């Protein structure tokens, strides 16, 4: 119990310190740190960074493109998984080329890995578009952002291939997580330097992006430490951060940019915006909960934090819907905005379902474990998918400098809404 309290104090100090210096600046050290940060982004690793273009929007565009690749792969995997749930002997005729089907655990891991990579990559790309648009129109280093996207893609691919050759455990995945943490650290430095390009106040989307990346670095780091020291409560805390806070932070970053941009009206309520931002990073989201601890006190505290974790979700949804009311006609004619609003409407529903099933799992009762898994995957496919469509239809054209090529964007949005 002492370890998880210590980790929580460190987390609050880390995020609080970052928020303080982001708001107040670093004083006389600012110029030197900017220079050092730019050197690390543009000169290291030597030679490799020169392979990527430093054009405006290229970093975000690369993240979104790699995310789209994983999105298609995860959709295929999801279809195969659903097919085998319906017919366990499906595709047995492919056994001659190595196809085999046991209990579906490998397919579940494959789908979760590819879908998580898709949602994270696309949402991060969208958040980078919003962040750069608010700070001079480009990232501090577009080439470095592209390099990190390429590295993320390859590490994810490696994590899918390695289990074929060696037996992978939680410790091995935590080491891969540390590689992810190093790449996210580079993206955080890039985002901070981008934020320092102008003297304007930090925007809402930028806040969610920066705090989400910082929380992810901390979560991946303590996950590795928890696995090494066998501290299960610390690992649980890390999972709550990486699987709970980070996706929602990126979703909020995208939503708070897309809807006001399309409607032409500012965010409806500053108070709800601050509530969704503050409460997200001090509570536990109801998604992807696992068994926390056998200690009654920790279970009680966890249940309270999960209950409070509903408030930032509700605050965000209400804020988005009320912002849309300023110009609903513009939203209807924008497939990206329709996707963002639909996600904001459906998010509380998935949160309520995840709340009841997740609490059941968190206290060690496995009676609703399969339902919780279905809800969590549905959350990623539907809510994550809709926000990804919002990025692809509204923000990707800004990064690429092109318009949508076809008219099927609206149909795709409605198919995800009704089909999940």
Language model features with spans:
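Short helix/strand-bridging catalytic loops that position acidic/His residues to coordinate divalent metals
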Residues: 232, 369, 399-404
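Long amphipathic alpha-helical scaffold segments
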Residues: 46-58, 62, 326, 330-331
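Membrane-embedded alpha-helical bundles that constitute the cytochrome b-like, heme-associated redox core
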Residues: 49-58, 82-97
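Inter-helical turn/loop segments and adjacent helix faces that build the functional surface
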Residues: 194-201, 261-265, 326-329
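Membrane-interface helix termini and inter-helical loops of multi-pass transporters
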Residues: 228-233, 295, 363-367
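Hydrophobic cores of alpha-helical transmembrane segments in multi-pass integral membrane proteins
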Residues: 2-46, 60-86, 100-166, 174-193, ...
